[in-house]
Structures are given as C-alpha cells and as structure tokens.
C-alpha cells in the first residue's frame, strides 16, 4: 500500500517520490544507482525522525487519525492468536464500529474488544467511521461480562472520534449504554488493560477505557472533545483547532505527566502507520508488562485499586503563598 503523507510531511513525501522514480529508472536501466537510492532512503528516515521529534499537539492529532494506522483487527491479528470474533448485543443489532471476541495472548485465553474504523469508503460506512451506537457498547458489555464469568483478562483498544450522535442512537439510549459500561467496568472482577491506539474521543472512548492499566501510543490522542469542536465552541471557528489542541493537553506525553495514563508506548519512526508489525511487537511487550502487574491481584484487590484510581482523578493540593 502506498503511504499517505500528511501536509506537514511534504518534505518527506517529495524525497520518497524521488526515490520511487530512481527505483523505476534502475529497473529499466543497466546503470547501478543502488547506492544513491540507499543514501536517499537513509536521508528520508532521518528527515522523518527529526520531523516527528518536534510535532505540535495539532500535528499529533492528525497522525492519530491517519487512514493507514493499524486498527483493532490489525492488532488482533499480529498480537493475539486464535481470535474468534463474536457478534451482536443480544438486544438489537451487531454494531460494526466495535469488534470483539475470544483470543489467546501468549497462550492465555482472553477477551479482546476495540473500536474499528474502515480503510475504504465502503468499509468506513459499514464501520460508521468508528463511531459506535448503543448496541456497540452493549456488545462490548456482553463480552466483558463473559470475560468475568470465565475469569479472562480483557484487552481494550480505543480509536474513535466519539460515540455516534445520531437521533437513532439517542432513541436507543446512547448515554445509558455509555454510563452502564462505566458502572460495570469499574467493578469488573477481572484485569482490564486499555490502550489508546488512535483517537480517544470523549465518552465514546471512555466507555471501553476504564482499566487497571491504561496506555497510549506515542501519537495517539485522548480528550473530552475534538480540537475542531473545542475551537468552534470557544472561538466560533474550527480554524483555531491548532490553538485548541495546544490548550487541551490531548497528547500522550501530557496525559502521562498528569497521571491520567500509566504508560506511553513508542511508535516506529514516522508513526505506527509506517510499520504495523513493528508497532504490534512493541505494543505486545507493553501489554505483557501491563498484565503482569495486575495478574496476581485477587478480584477484590483489582476492584479496590481500580476504584481508587478513578477517585484519584482531579485531586489536588492547595499551597498557601507566603
């Protein structure tokens, strides 16, 4: 698949285009230009690395939405074995914006749940652009209760602009479905490991993100509203999205410093979309470590620590100024 470059990656895109032309020339010529191609490839990697080392929050938001980033089903294929997808909420329908099922993680049975976006137009519509309806959250809830029944750890992968705001979703109880998930996940008696792999959009993300260990990929985002939405409210213009992203603190590094997540998982040079397999292997090691930290806790200890974690959000200390 040909790499899609973002606007700020144009210098890299130009260099890659030049490399592609040289490859074409080499295929049709007796002249050996492999050294020149290798030199330009090294230059491209260095340029990309330097570019990504100083991304702004708004640029990170764009990377988190990159159409070629690995999605939940990609990680299910690369990290887990024997994945069997389960469908439906047993109440209304099967929401394709959330996928989930049984799998094995290093030989251990587990449950995998996550948002799923589409690659092409047809799949994007099928997946509703990764925006779940109530039946999607109720499907996730059904799988979490199944995990609790059989004592299986739960791995959740978050990547959504937010819960679907359509009238049909509201009629079927969107807010109740999200609230119910938060309530049940807070007291689920099995380990929950959550990873924000792309966009973490508001309650639509949080509904499968109440975990014992919460991680974020390096160029993922997590926020109560999109930068464009925030800018439209505060400045009456989505053109202020860059300023909003800076103000909101949506990046993994910022959220780690605030204690809202436990770990930042580094991405390959140029982002996770550049190398799905490398990203999956890095994430697998992080998941192993996260599960190891909670695997030996009793159900009561899991719930106690999870509730303590939730209640710690927003705490602050007052200091008197002399």
Curated annotation (Swiss-Prot):
E.C. no: 2.1.3.15
Residue ranges constituting the CoA carboxyltransferase C-terminal domain according to the UniProt record: 32-293
Reactions performed catalytically: N(6)-carboxybiotinyl-L-lysyl-[protein] + acetyl-CoA = N(6)-biotinyl-L-lysyl-[protein] + malonyl-CoA
Domain of life of the organism encoding this protein: Bacteria
Pathway: Lipid metabolism; malonyl-CoA biosynthesis; malonyl-CoA from acetyl-CoA: step 1/1
GO biological process annotation, one example: malonyl-CoA biosynthetic process
A Pfam family recorded for this sequence: ACCA
InterPro entries xrefs: Acetyl_CoA_COase_a_su, ClpP/crotonase-like_dom_sf, COA_CT_C
GO cellular component, one term: acetyl-CoA carboxylase complex
Entry's family note: Belongs to the AccA family.
Function comment: Component of the acetyl coenzyme A carboxylase (ACC) complex. First, biotin carboxylase catalyzes the carboxylation of biotin on its carrier protein (BCCP) and then the CO(2) group is transferred by the carboxyltransferase to acetyl-CoA to form malonyl-CoA.
Protein name, per record: Acetyl-coenzyme A carboxylase carboxyl transferase subunit alpha
Organism expressing this protein natively: Aromatoleum aromaticum (strain DSM 19018 / LMG 30748 / EbN1)
């Amino acid at each position: 698949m040909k790499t899609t470059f973002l606007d700020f990656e144009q210098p890299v895109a130009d260099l890659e285009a030049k490399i592609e032309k040289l490859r074409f020339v080499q295929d049709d010529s007796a002249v050996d230009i492999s050294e020149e191609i290798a030199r330009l490839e090294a230059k491209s990697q260095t340029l990309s690395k330097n570019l990504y080392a100083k991304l702004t929050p708004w640029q990170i938001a764009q990377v988190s939405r990159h159409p070629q980033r690995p999605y939940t089903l990609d990680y299910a294929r690369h990290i887990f074995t024997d994945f069997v997808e389960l469908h439906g909420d047993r109440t209304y329908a099967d929401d394709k914006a959330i996928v989930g099922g049984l799998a094995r993680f290093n030989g251990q049975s587990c449950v995998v749940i996550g948002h799923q976006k589409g690659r092409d137009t047809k799949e994007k519509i099928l997946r509703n652009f990764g925006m779940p309806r109530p039946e999607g959250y109720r499907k996730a809830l059904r799988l979490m209760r199944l995990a609790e029944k059989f004592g299986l750890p739960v791995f959740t992968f978050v990547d959504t602009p937010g819960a679907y705001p359509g009238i049909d979703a509201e009629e079927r109880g969107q807010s109740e479905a999200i609230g119910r998930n938060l309530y049940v996940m807070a007291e689920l008696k099995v380990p929950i490991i959550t990873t924000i792999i792309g966009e973490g959009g508001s309650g639509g993300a949080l509904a499968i993100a109440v975990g014992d260990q919460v991680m974020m990929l390096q160029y993922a985002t997590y926020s109560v509203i999109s930068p464009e939405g925030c800018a439209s409210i505060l400045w009456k213009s989505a053109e202020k999205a860059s300023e909003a992203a800076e103000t909101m603190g949506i990046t993994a590094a910022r959220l780690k410093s605030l204690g809202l997540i436990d770990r930042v998982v580094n991405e390959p040079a140029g982002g996770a979309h550049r190398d799905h397999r490398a990203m999956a292997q890095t994430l697998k090691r992080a998941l192993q470590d996260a599960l190891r930290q909670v695997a030996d806790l009793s159900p009561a200890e899991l719930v106690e620590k999870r509730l303590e974690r939730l209640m710690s959000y927003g705490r602050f200390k007052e200091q008197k100024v002399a």
